[in-house]
UniProtKB/Swiss-Prot annotation:
Database matches in Pfam families: Pantoate_transf (PF02548)
Record keywords, A-Z: Cytoplasm, Magnesium, Metal-binding, Pantothenate biosynthesis, Transferase
The protein's name: 3-methyl-2-oxobutanoate hydroxymethyltransferase
Organism for this UniProt entry: Mesorhizobium japonicum (strain LMG 29417 / CECT 9101 / MAFF 303099)
Subcellular location(s) of the protein: Cytoplasm
Gene designation: panB
Catalytic activity: 3-methyl-2-oxobutanoate + (6R)-5,10-methylene-5,6,7,8-tetrahydrofolate + H2O = 2-dehydropantoate + (6S)-5,6,7,8-tetrahydrofolate
SUPFAM superfamilies according to UniProt: Phosphoenolpyruvate/pyruvate domain (SSF51621)
Stretch list, region Disordered: 263-286
Main location: cytoplasm
Annotated binding of 3-methyl-2-oxobutanoate, by residue: D51, S52, D90, K120
The keyword Magnesium appears for this protein: yes
KW rRNA processing (keyword) present: no
Binding positions (Mg(2+)): D51, D90, E122
Amino acid sequence: MATKLPTTDIRIGAELIRRRKGGVPLVCLTAYTYPVARLLDPHVDLLLVGDSVSMVLHGHATTLGASLGMMIAHGQAVMRGSARACVVVDMPAGSYEDSAAQAVASARRIVDETGCQAVKLEGGVDMAGQIAAIAAAGIPVMGHIGLLPQSVEKDGGYKIKGRTDETVAALMADARAVEKAGAFSVVIEGTIEAVAADITRRIAIPTIGIGASGDCDGQILVIDDMVGLTVDRVPKFVKEYADLRSVIANAAERYAAEVRDRTFPGPSHVFSGSKASSDLNGGDES
């Protein structure tokens, strides 16, 4: 059954997300394309145009392959494909770290060129100034603490956070700094479960967990991981709700066989002369 085109602006805004603290868990997924946004929009509260797009769709080894132009292009596609979900666009590495002024300029460009509801950036105490400046400019901003994909090269890989008293204290400081700076919510990624749960209890803005805790105020996964489309190793925290790898591989195998034995295209997939509909997409022949 075809998904209806979005026709009415009934967007969930950042303020509504903020008010969901402690309520029914927020449902969040990444989206990078128009058709996927259309399919997900009726079921989620928030769509994140994550810089993971550089890995998932563009084949880069890390999220550092994302550029501002790339994020804007995918943000535009997701906005076109959705009508209800709050759309948040990641600020890629290199677009905000240098100064508050740089962060505001990049955030404003993202919002102006996509129409998205908010932006997201990585970092806690060290990025509080950037978060505060973006929020002061009237642009809703989501924080991101814990495992920071943009810092994996500096950190020596994807390391779980919160294993020592020192790192637990640092995570709590990051969460409080993000909250105080004016973020409307914060992603907590790749932490010890009890630490994420404690942070959730101690701060007043919603926490969105990914490899964190079921006690977070919401959960997010990369869409390709969730539907079983990821072709490389899938993180432990992912639950696959479908197996699109097999669906696509089997469809390609069947298509190849039918092309080679000339059973495709069949009579119903070609135009039969004067009685053919003039509509390329089909229609009754008369």
